[in-house]
Structure formats: structure tokens, C-alpha cells
Amino acid sequence: AEHVYRLSIAERPHIDFVVPPAGQPGKVGRFTLYGRNLPGGVDSGMVLEGKPLQKKEVTINLPGDAKARMNLSGTSPVGPRQAGFDGIEYRLPSPKGSSNPVRIFFSDAPVIGEVTAPNDRPTEAQKITVPCDYAGLFYPRRDRDWVTFDAKKGDVYWVEVVSDRLGAPTNPFFRVERVTKNDKGEEKVSTVKEVTESPVNVGGTLFNTTSVDPEYRFAVPEDG
């Protein structure tokens, strides 16, 4: 009699993911919801597990007070890998009822979205300004995205991918390359570092925070 469960069947919206997954606290952000039964949603052209997804743009006001920054409230469970991220829980309202909850995390830097133009080759790299949070999509499967930015000698950056810790079934990898030009204007590319994963567990066996998300401390050796 103690082993009970609840089965709910409804026409309410279902959100699969949000782009970007983070925004700056204290600001109003534009977000695109991807899912099914989204009121006013349009075809996204994407398919997830054989099912077409809709998309819908929404405006969300992210709280910026100190209390909100230190609180990760909501009804959905938070695993050890996500426990280090602050944010809010969001539900899309509709006449059929509110959607499932999704988390939108706080970013300390401006959020830059992936361009719609192709950026899956080095020659098509998207130019960004750092520091920033770059929000992209691994779509289609085995997608590659290239970005480029200017760096000065002596600058130090933390380059970090957050995907596995968002609950996505991914195994990210990134490469840092330096692009220089000779007197003729010809580009030369050299690899600085390839990073596959950073399996750091700060919680021990009782609170395992291990993730396959890669990170790298990039100390800029030369202007580039």
C-alpha cells in the first residue's frame, strides 16, 4: 500500500530545453523555448527522439537581488553536478495549464547566442567578445561550432563548457587554437590545447560532482 504513484495525462505545454540556458540576473532576457504543445509555437525544424519540436520566444525577467542569487528554488530535483549553479525555475503558462519546470541559470557575463549562419568550419568561425557566455546547440548530431576572439599577452581566461551539467546527454570537447598572419597576410594555425574532460569531484563519494564537461585555464602567451 505504500508503493504508490501518480499518472497525469494532460494537454499542457512540455518544454524540452531553453536557448540560451542562462541569462544575466537583474535583466530582462529573450529566450527561445523548444518543446511540444507550446501556445503560439511554430515549427522549429528540429526533431527530438523522432518527434518534431515547436519553438516559442518569451521574455523573462531574471531577479537580481542578493537573496535570489543565492537561492536555487523549485520543484524539480537538482543533482550534485548542478548544485553549483544559481538560477530560477520557469514554467510556461497556458489555458491548458502550466508547463513542466525548466531551469534558467544565472550568468556573470553577457550572453551571446550562436548565429544562424553556418559556423561549423574554421573559416566560418563566429567572432565574439570575451568575457562572455556563448550559448550554442549541438545540432545536428556531432555538430561542431567555431568561435574566434582577440586575446592579449598576459590575459588569463577560464574556458569552460557547461552541457553535461545542464542534464544534456553530451560529451563535449574543445580545442584552443592560435591564428597568426605572416607578412603576406597568410594565416597560420597552431594548437594551444585540446581538452576532452575535467573529471573533478569536489563532493567525494557522498556528493559526486564529476562531469565530462571540459574546462581549461588559458594564459595567453602572445597577442593573437
Spans of model-derived segments:
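Predominantly extracellular/luminal regions of secreted and cell-surface proteins
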Residues: 93-131, 180
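Short, aromatic- and glycine-rich surface loops/edge beta-strands on solvent-exposed regions
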Residues: 1, 83-95, 104
